[in-house]
């Protein structure tokens, strides 16, 4: 069974509580449970990880080397700041797709730049929690 890793960055543990008018009212746990069920139905294993700190995310990416076939990542605020996470993704050379709940291009100007978009397989943004479903579908299609 192939493994897909769902990585979520800072403050995403607050989904459902934090600015629901921007991020929706679903919790991260609800999203993860739904995606795990979808993955299992199609014969894939989905592992989920969320951290508020850059070091923990980098360490999890390093641990993925040789064990994970595809990464779905919502780097959250690290999208616009983390060269270190970018370098970790390049180091492990695991294909990945970038996901954002909100449309980062229509928000504050400091959110318009992503350190990941040019090295990702694609970007899904602005589609709310459904964006994760589309990302999982893409990951599975890529692995078939």
Curated annotation (Swiss-Prot):
Keyword Lyase: yes
Catalytic activity: 3-dehydroquinate = 3-dehydroshikimate + H2O
Keyword Translocase: no
Keywords: Amino-acid biosynthesis, Aromatic amino acid biosynthesis, Lyase
Coiled-coil stretches: none
Site (Transition state stabilizer): 18
Positions annotated as active site in the UniProt record: 23 (proton acceptor), 100 (proton donor)
GO MF, one annotated term: 3-dehydroquinate dehydratase activity
Binding of substrate, residues: 74, 80, 87, 101-102, 111
EC number: 4.2.1.10
Biological process, per Gene Ontology: amino acid biosynthetic process; aromatic amino acid family biosynthetic process; chorismate biosynthetic process; quinate catabolic process
Pathway field: Metabolic intermediate biosynthesis; chorismate biosynthesis; chorismate from D-erythrose 4-phosphate and phosphoenolpyruvate: step 3/7
InterPro entries registered for this protein in UniProt: DHquinase_II, DHquinase_II_CS, DHquinase_II_sf
Physiological role: Catalyzes a trans-dehydration via an enolate intermediate.
NCBIfam families found in the cross-reference section: aroQ (TIGR01088), PRK05395.1-1 (NF003804), PRK05395.1-2 (NF003805), PRK05395.1-3 (NF003806), PRK05395.1-4 (NF003807)
Family statement: Belongs to the type-II 3-dehydroquinase family.
Subunit structure, as described in the record: Homododecamer.
Protein's UniProt name: 3-dehydroquinate dehydratase
Organism: Haemophilus ducreyi (strain 35000HP / ATCC 700724)
Gene: aroQ
